[in-house]
Every structure is written in structure tokens, then in C-alpha cells.
Amino acid sequence: MAETQGKVITCKAAVVWGPKVPLVIQEICVDPPQKMEVRVKILYSSICHTDLGCWNGTNEAERAFPRILGHEAVGIVESVGEGVKDVKEGDYVIPTFNGECGECKVCKREESNLCERYHVDPMKRVMVNDGGTRFSTTINKDGGSSQSQPIYHFLNTSTFTEYTVLDSACVVKIDPNSPLKQMSLLSCGVSTGVGAAWNIANVKEGKSTAVFGLGSVGLAVAEGARARGASRIIGVDANASKFEKGKLMGVTDFINPKDLTKPVHQMIREITGGGVDYSFECTGNVDVLREAFLSTHVGWGSTVLVGIYPTPRTLPLHPMELFDGRRITGSVFGGFKPKSQLPNFAQQCMKGVVKLEPFITNELPFEKINDAFQLLRDGKSLRCILQISKLLKR
């Protein structure tokens, strides 16, 4: 890749030009990385509901177009900017939307993974260095003239492109012999779910759990709880078609709210003798959050917020409901510090501690990205892997 270092690269990217507008595969220019930045050739990328939410324009504050979405991927370092020491040309890496500088007070503490400078920020659309973008395209103006049009970044990553530029804090080196398609899942969904069970709730062997929402993240929570030896994993979802997949992730009981004549939390309390030890809310619905909280056992029950909440509604709890010892906490990227902890997690996945294969339900070429979005919208896909670039040799 030496022939492209320090030069602008012209490549293909899927650009979204407005809410709910089909993505356009088009030619863009990708600038060289600046200080503490890395330019990566993307090999595979998958689609997450967060991509879908931004494409939908669900949160007006997040709207910024044109934009390159995508944040779950795996790729090869093409070149690095000044000061980058931990990765080099040819390294296999995964991008992470939540970075780790290793220098700030948060990175130096065990209690949090929210780096002061590179933590996840859905409103962020430019690079930290200079407040500019590294993507652009040419648009035609009236009268036949043309001009360069900047294209915004997304979640510190932007992976629906053959080449992307990231802050080095958001690039994690992985084993070159790892299964690349599966490794892309660690950029978001699987790490977020498994980490919520391992790092945030700290699920113990023999304990009971309830997972509300059996999408990719919810199933990853279940898989994490299974790997930790949970004796009972209750899956809650209104889509009965998800239950079969849940069995592969260790779910022992299934509840479809549509089949009940009583609140879900009441049913869970009845079948568990008072409530579960841990509950996980993975839908981003505050009403479901209340059910998840009330499904935990008085005195020690713990509820973890994993879903994204786009609405301005507040937490539907009375302070006295916390008085009895139940807890509620949030989770970002499963509590994983990406650079210092994700490589070990990847090794555990390679050893089979966590099963990654069942999460990949579809594979499509890059040019079929709009079909992949439709599969997710229709609930027919957990993770659809897109081949962005060809891997010539390994």
C-alpha cells in the first residue's frame, strides 16, 4: 500500500444524502491521515440498528448529510499519521465507536471506559484534530461548474466505504489469523451485549437473568450470560421468530408479551419466585425499561440499560422504587476499554468462549447495501456482512 501513502485515495463509498433516502454507491476522495490518525482499508462491514436509526433521521440533532454511516467492521491499516505507534501498515484492525486514548484520567481508571476525548458521541461528525472531514466528493452546480462537497463522519468510524480515516484511539489491532468476518461483530453489537453481562452486571454462575429485546445486542447479552454460567436466561420479545435463535445463545425461557394477560414483570416474578437477579433492557423503550426493572428481585436485583433511547422521555421510576435495594445502571460498549481489553476478548471468542457464528445471518456484496438495510428493517437479519473490499492475500 506504499504507493498510496500520503496521497488522496479515490474509492467507492455508500453515501446517505438525507433521511430515509437510499444510500448511493459513489466515488469519493479520502484524504491522508493527519497526526494521530489512521487510514484503513475496510474489508467487511455489518449493519447495526444504530446505522438504521441515523439513516431514518430518528433524532433530529444527529442529522448531518451527506454522511458515511457504518461502525462495525474489520480492515487493514493502509497508512498512519504522525505520532501513531501502536499500529502500522498491514496490521489487521477493527474500528470502535468508543475510543481509548490511554492518557486521560478516565482511561487511567478502572471504573469507566468513556475516554474524555474520544468517547462515543452520536452528534460528532468531524475529526478531532482540526474539526474537518477526511471525505469529499464532487458535485455539479448550476451552469455546469463543479465544487468539492465535504462528507461527514459517523460515530468515530464511517465504515461503509473502501477506505476510512479514524482517530488512532478508535483503532484496535487484532490477531491476523482471526476469522475476519466474525471479528467485525466486536466493533459494536457483540461486545456491547456480552460486556453488559460480564463487565457491568458481572453475572455470576447459577444466577438468573432476563433479557428484554432479542436483537443482536440482546442475544449477545444472553450469550454472555450463558458463558458465565447463568442457570436461567429468560428472553422477552414480541417477535416469536427470534426465539429459535435465542436457544442457540442459551436462552432457557421465552416470553412473548402479546401472549400475556398480565404485565411481563409479574409473569417473571411468578416463574422465578420473586424476580431475576439481573435484567437487561435492549430495546430503547422506556416502558420496557420499567418492566425490566420491576422484573428484578427486591433487595439485590440489578437492571442494565443497553438500548439506545432516542426520545426525550424521562426514566419512569419513583425514587422509593430504588429504596428496596434494586439497582439500575447504564452500559456503553459493554464497559470494554477497546484498546486494552478488546484484543483479549477477541482471543476468547476465537477459543469458543463466546459463539460468533450464529450472529451472522446474511452476507451480501457492497453494492447490495440497501437490500441489507431492508433486511434489518424487516426483522429478517441479525447481522448482514457486506464485503466492502477484496482481500488479495493473507
Curated annotation (Swiss-Prot):
Signal peptide: none annotated. SUPFAM superfamilies: GroES-like (SSF50129), NAD(P)-binding Rossmann-fold domains (SSF51735). Belongs to the zinc-containing alcohol dehydrogenase family. Class-III subfamily. Zn(2+) 2 binds at residues 101, 104, 107, 115. Its main location: cytoplasm. Its EC number is 1.1.1.1. Zn(2+) 1 binds at residues 48, 50, 71, 188. It comes from the Eukaryota. An alcohol binds at residues 50, 71. It comes from Arabidopsis thaliana. GO terms for molecular function: alcohol dehydrogenase (NAD+) activity; zinc ion binding. Keywords: Cytoplasm, Metal-binding, NAD, Oxidoreductase, Zinc. InterPro entries: ADH-like_C, ADH-like_N, ADH_Zn_CS, GroES-like_sf, NAD(P)-bd_dom_sf. It is found in: Cytoplasm. NAD(+) binds at residues 50, 213-218, 237, 242, 283, 306-308, 333, 383. PANTHER family: ALCOHOL DEHYDROGENASE, ALCOHOL DEHYDROGENASE-LIKE 3. Binds 2 Zn(2+) ions per subunit. This is Alcohol dehydrogenase-like 3. Its cofactor is Zn(2+). It is an enzyme of class 1 (oxidoreductase). Homodimer. It catalyses: a primary alcohol + NAD(+) = an aldehyde + NADH + H(+); a secondary alcohol + NAD(+) = a ketone + NADH + H(+). GO terms for cellular component: cytoplasm.
